[in-house]
């Protein structure tokens, strides 16, 4: 399955509120084609050294493309940051619920244990979705840059991925990995407690 179709399928399955924050892969593909068309052929902007930023910056269509790419990147990165922070808060809420349920001095209804277990499962699922969001967007930026290089004859992908993408929080997300491990442990702890 082509990446664009795969991405559309994943977006369809994800939280609808996240829709605007995914990379707009289709739009960026169109921009590449417009960049090539505007510059008068796939190799016109690549008449100098193919990865020299000075040569690339002289081509207006290239400047527009990379400005749009950075806008997409900022949008995705900002959303990931706020979602990751929200996950930290949500984990603490589920953890606090577990501690309250363990407290024998507090009265609990018969469904409290089941609700807490369901909350833990929902939280885990949401963190997995956020990890998937990070991975799919990273792949999207990589693919769009490879496509750009193929169509324009430039060699910008590797440099952009190393110098720009690697600085973004969603490209390496240790906090998400830690949250997944913590929630797995919490789930086991909840399952193991006396009802």
Regions found by a protein language model. Give the residues of each.
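Phospho-regulated, Ser/Thr/Pro-rich intrinsically disordered or coiled-coil terminal scaffolds
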Residues: 1-150, 155, 160-161, 166-170, ...
